[in-house]
């Protein structure tokens, strides 16, 4: 079933178009990279749509506004965790903005898992969010494991019941290895496999 989706010309074209956008992000400036990081901070414990809308509400203010302003904007656009995420955005900006691309690029170019480990030092960034960020700036060797991917793996019999809200690091890596095996069998990168599964589960390619 998934193989036929991967081989579907229309779906494949849409997925590869999105992949090209991620590859362009890899060549983009620090502002684009920090925007992608902010999106991943907002996506944690929220839907992608909610996070994307919140990011658009914030606009360029992610680069300079204080915590109170960011909190107010998030609240006004009905983003749920406006207090916590405003704090995380400011903390991330103070910690990495201006050197994010410079520090992550050489790591990710040599070892994407090491780059992910580095990103875990940012408050609010977990395994999923770090993997999501790296995929969105053009690195495709890590899995973005959310409830959609877990539901998919459970349905095909690859895993049993799992509580996605309490996923340990070791369990995440174990699930990632399952997805990498599936991706290898389909001759695609696991970060690209994610887009096909996302499309299968949601009928969209917006991640």
Swiss-Prot record:
<keyword id="KW-0227">DNA damage</keyword>
<feature type="site" description="Important for guanine/8-oxoguanine distinction">
    <location>
        <position position="207"/>
    </location>
</feature>
<dbReference type="InterPro" id="IPR023170">
    <property type="entry name" value="HhH_base_excis_C"/>
</dbReference>
<dbReference type="InterPro" id="IPR003265">
    <property type="entry name" value="HhH-GPD_domain"/>
</dbReference>
<dbReference type="GO" id="GO:0140078">
    <property type="term" value="F:class I DNA-(apurinic or apyrimidinic site) endonuclease activity"/>
</dbReference>
<keyword id="KW-0326">Glycosidase</keyword>
<keyword id="KW-0378">Hydrolase</keyword>
<dbReference type="Pfam" id="PF22175">
    <property type="entry name" value="Ogg-HhH"/>
</dbReference>
<protein>
    <recommendedName>
        <fullName>8-oxoguanine DNA glycosylase/AP lyase</fullName>
        <ecNumber>3.2.2.-</ecNumber>
        <ecNumber>4.2.99.18</ecNumber>
    </recommendedName>
</protein>
<dbReference type="InterPro" id="IPR012092">
    <property type="entry name" value="DNA_glyclase/AP_lyase_Ogg"/>
</dbReference>
<comment type="function">
    <text>Catalyzes the excision of an oxidatively damaged form of guanine (7,8-dihydro-8-oxoguanine = 8-oxoG) from DNA. Also cleaves the DNA backbone at apurinic/apyrimidinic sites (AP sites).</text>
</comment>
<dbReference type="GO" id="GO:0016799">
    <property type="term" value="F:hydrolase activity, hydrolyzing N-glycosyl compounds"/>
</dbReference>
<keyword id="KW-0511">Multifunctional enzyme</keyword>
<keyword id="KW-0456">Lyase</keyword>
<keyword id="KW-0234">DNA repair</keyword>
<dbReference type="GO" id="GO:0006284">
    <property type="term" value="P:base-excision repair"/>
</dbReference>
<feature type="active site">
    <location>
        <position position="128"/>
    </location>
</feature>
<dbReference type="InterPro" id="IPR011257">
    <property type="entry name" value="DNA_glycosylase"/>
</dbReference>
<comment type="similarity">
    <text>Belongs to the type-2 OGG1 family.</text>
</comment>
<feature type="active site">
    <location>
        <position position="146"/>
    </location>
</feature>
């Amino acid at each position: 079933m998934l193989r036929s989706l991967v081989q579907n010309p229309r779906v494949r074209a849409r997925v590869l178009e999105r992949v090209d956008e991620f590859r362009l992000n890899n060549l983009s400036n620090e502002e684009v990279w920090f925007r992608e990081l902010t999106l991943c901070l907002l996506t944690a414990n929220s839907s992608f749509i909610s996070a994307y809308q919140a990011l658009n509400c914030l606009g360029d203010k992610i680069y300079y506004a204080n915590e109170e302003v960011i909190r107010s904007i998030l609240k006004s656009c009905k983003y749920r965790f406006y207090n916590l995420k405003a704090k995380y955005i400011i903390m991330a900006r103070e910690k990495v903005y201006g050197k994010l691309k410079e520090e992550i690029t050489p790591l990710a170019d040599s070892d994407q898992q090491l780059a992910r480990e580095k990103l875990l030092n940012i408050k609010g960034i977990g395994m999923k969010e770090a993997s999501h960020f790296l995929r969105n700036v053009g690195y495709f060797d890590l899995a973005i494991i959310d409830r959609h991917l877990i539901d998919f793996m459970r349905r095909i019999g690859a895993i049993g019941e799992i509580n996605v809200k309490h996923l340990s690091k070791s369990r995440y890596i174990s699930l990632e290895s399952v997805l990498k095996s599936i991706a290898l069998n389909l001759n695609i990168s696991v970060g690209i496999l994610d887009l096909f599964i996302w499309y299968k589960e949601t009928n969209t390619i917006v991640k």
